[in-house]
Each structure stands twice: as structure tokens, then as C-alpha cells.
Amino acid sequence: AYLGGRMNYFSGNYTGYVTTRLKSNDASLLDIELDCDQTGWGITPIFGLDYKIGRWNIGAKYEMRTLLNIENTTEKNSDPEGALSDFKDGVNTPNDIPAMLSIATSYRFTDRLRASVEYHFYDDKHAGMANIPGTNIGKQHALTHGTNEYLAGAEFDLNKTVTVSAGIQRTDYGLSNNYESDTSFSCDSYSIGFGGAIKLLPKLTMNIAYFWTNYSDYTKAVEASSTGGYNGTTLAGTNVYSRTNKVFGLGFDYKF
């Protein structure tokens, strides 16, 4: 059994600008600029259990919700009362780390080959978030469900010095149009990773890994409306949210 906690500190920055014009009449659609630093901190209580029997190892961990408010220090905000209202100087915005349940099991096939499967659930719908643009409703209420993650991996000892590994991960968010916005969005994904460990010395091990994530595009269509439409133009429009992620990691473990 395990009982502990984690101290979290966040420091980030939004810097950029957007200029958009309509082709039909060259009218300005959007012209905004932002330079904002954000900081915040919180403490996460953690509970864990681990049970070993024969070649099996079963574990579970629960991280409680972390109350986290992000404070803005804003140098430039061209639309503080509109699209960029969440980035006003001095404003504190809820940005909780959701409660998380993790359940995993691993099996040792031989002394050299091991494999594991794991499930994570993030209770996003009960974590405080920034408001849906133009409302006083937190974005967490726009989600259809919390985040589900499914993972599997294996590692094999080539010899007493070198270990290789591989794994996959599937992430499923409960996304909706009201949750996705131009300044904050998510995309469902699956990931594939490969890695290795080399024992350089009896107490020193080097770890190396490559991680690639393929994200599913999220398409948000807005219907024409005399009182709104796409970005206030009254016209119909579509946003496609997409991202890419490729990570290379290198680390060292030393046993004292």
C-alpha cells in the first residue's frame, strides 16, 4: 500500500497573433494579438496498492483532483472583453488536474520477457476548467464523458546489459463542439513507442526512447445565422483542429 502526494507547479506562455479576412469583400474577420504568462500550483494526494503473486503483478493508483488556478500576467491582449477574455491581466482561471484512476497488471513470461496492460480514467467532467467562450459555464460540462486511456507494452532483456521495449496507447476524450475552441482543444489519439535501456555501470543505466502520436482531426462546423454564424460573420464555416507529436527521450538512472 502507498500513501503520498505530489506538488505541481505550472508555468506557461501564450504568444502569437491571428489575422483573418473574408475573400468575398476583403472585410476583416479576426485580428487579435496575445502575449500572456501563466503560473499556478496545487497538491495532489495519491493512494496506491500493489500485489504480487507468482508471475503476476497487479497494481492500482488513485490520484485525487488537484485544485489549480492559473493566474495571468499579460503584456499584450488586443481583445480582453471578447475572444481573449480568459487572458486578462491578473485574472485567475480554474485549470484543475482531474482525479485519475489507474489499474494495471503485468506478467513475467520468462526471466527475460515481461508484458503489461493498463487502464487510466481521468474524471475531467468534475475538474474545474475555463468557461465556454461567451458563457459562464465551465468547459468540463461540455464533455460527454471523462478521458479513457488503454495501454499495453512489453520488454525483453537481450542480455544482462541491454533491454528493449515497445508499447501502444489509445486515448479517447469525450469531445464536443462547445469544448473545442481556437485557444484550447484536444484530439483523440493513439501512440506507439519504442525504447531501450543500457546498463553502463553496475549502478548506472541509460534509458532511450522514441514516442510517436497520431491524432484524429476534430471538425467543428458552424451553421449560418443572422445573429451569429462563423466568428460573427452570419456565414457558415468550419474549423478543423489537428496536431502532431513526436518525442525523443534520453535519461539516466543511478542506484545509490
Describe the residue ranges of each PLM region.
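Outer-membrane beta-barrel porins/channels
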Residues: A1-F256
